[in-house]
């Protein structure tokens, strides 16, 4: 298949959605498909011989700094470039529900090209940025806006989890919902390695993710401060985002040594291998690739049981779930796993085994089936006699 992937940000892999899209594209190409990208970027970012349809960055007055701090970029639609890419493709896959996708769907319909769309942007990711993450009417309004702006025209919608598929159905989305995990990179497998000098002798608690309001790293910092073993714990928050300064101030006020940093993949693999426990405190999550990668490496997760997060689906028992937002309950869970190393080692193997269900190769095969269905339905519609 000739597949056009339309995504505002592809060549700057500094957020989970972009990293996931790049992995999908890599495997699709390994399967023999010709995949091209429509995205922001410049020619020097392309691989030798790569054809792409490049857009300029769209600036958003007032909110530009906030958008950048979240690791996001919006594309300024170049209609000619976008139409050239869509005309070339057998099928078009739209990744995010913003202006580039809105314009692309209009072009695809005009050219009678089949297309699919993914739902990767949870409304709470947007509303939390302006401290309205728990405002039901605001989040419902964003679901409605996404539906009217993009998804009402989509017959096939990729949902990374059953939770988000349920939310879409509840908010009146009528397309066929394909629940397909983003998948786990095969490089993330069970591993352990000796701790470096800075971590030696410490019980290392790790969380990976954007430092933003809805991720709730503040709960984890408070939980470590409440732990009976706080002096034995080294907390590592891997990620970047607008909340870093506030989190650093919180840790300093509580007298905790917290390591902050954004780690390239090789360093991240080493960090996971040196960690003892993985914690995921997020209130809102469509799937949580970082948590999946951690338990694929054999780290036992402790996950917030938020109703707006799909991540609790990965908990094998209640020992891996804590009450969302409750730092005292989280502290109890951290202490439990620290005090029961034999149980933790036993569960490490169980979680690494669980990860095999989310094999990236299998997930891409499911996406290919969705693309093929969209193409077949489009061909049947084109061949049908018109009144």
Please tell me what each predicted stretch does.
Residues 196-225:
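Conserved donor-binding/catalytic core segment of Leloir-type glycosyltransferases
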Residues 316-327, 336-341:
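Conserved acidic donor-binding segment of nucleotide-sugar-dependent glycosyltransferases
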Residues 184-201:
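Acidic anion/phosphate-binding donor-loop and adjacent secondary structure
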Residues 110, 123, 138-156, 171:
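Membrane-proximal helix-turn-helix segments that form the acceptor-binding/catalytic region
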Residues 97, 283:
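Aromatic "clamp/platform" in nucleotide-sugar-dependent glycosyltransferases that forms part
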Residues 300-305:
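Short hydrophobic beta-strand element within catalytic cores of glycosyltransferases
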Residues 41, 163, 183:
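Carbohydrate-associated surface elements
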Residues 245-266:
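Nucleotide-activated donor-binding/catalytic signature segment of Leloir-type glycosyltransferases, i.e.
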């Amino acid at each position: 298949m000739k597949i056009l992937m339309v995504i505002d940000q592809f060549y700057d892999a500094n957020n989970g959605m972009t990293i996931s899209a790049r992995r999908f594209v890599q495997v699709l190409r390994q399967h023999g498909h010709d995949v091209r990208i429509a995205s922001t970027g410049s020619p020097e970012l392309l691989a030798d011989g790569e054809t792409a349809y490049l857009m300029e960055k769209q600036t958003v007055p007032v909110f530009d700094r906030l958008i950048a701090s979240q690791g996001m970029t919006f594309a300024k639609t170049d209609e000619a470039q976008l139409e050239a890419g869509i005309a070339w493709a057998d099928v078009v896959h739209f990744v995010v529900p913003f202006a580039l996708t809105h314009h692309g769907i209009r072009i695809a319909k005009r050219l009678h090209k089949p297309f699919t769309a993914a739902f990767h942007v949870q409304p709470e990711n947007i509303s939390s940025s302006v401290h309205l993450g728990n405002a039901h009417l605001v989040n419902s309004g964003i679901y409605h806006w996404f539906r009217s702006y993009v998804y009402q025209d989509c017959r096939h919608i990729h949902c990374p989890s059953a939770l988000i598929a349920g939310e879409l159905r509840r908010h009146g989305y009528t397309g066929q919902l394909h629940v397909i995990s983003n998948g786990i990179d095969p490089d993330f497998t069970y591993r352990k390695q000796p701790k470096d000098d800075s971590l030696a002798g410490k019980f290392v608690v790790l969380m990976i993710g954007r430092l933003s309001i809805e991720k709730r790293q503040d709960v984890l910092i408070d939980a470590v401060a409440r732990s009976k073993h706080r002096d034995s714990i080294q907390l590592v928050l891997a990620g970047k985002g607008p909340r870093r300064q506030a989190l650093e101030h919180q840790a300093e006020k509580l007298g905790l040594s917290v390591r902050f940093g954004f780690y390239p993949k090789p360093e991240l693999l080493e960090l996971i291998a040196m960690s003892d426990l993985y914690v995921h405190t997020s209130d809102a999550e469509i799937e949580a690739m970082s948590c999946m990668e951690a338990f694929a490496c054999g780290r036992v997760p402790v996950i917030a049981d938020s109703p707006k997060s799909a991540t609790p689906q990965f908990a094998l028992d209640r020992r891996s779930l804590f009450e969302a937002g409750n730092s005292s309950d989280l502290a109890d869970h951290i202490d439990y796993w620290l005090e029961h190393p034999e149980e933790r080692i036993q569960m490490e193997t169980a979680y690494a085994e669980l990860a095999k269900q989310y094999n990236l190769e299998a997930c891409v095969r499911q996406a290919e089936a969705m693309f093929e269905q969209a193409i077949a339905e489009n061909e049947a519609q084109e061949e049908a006699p018109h009144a």
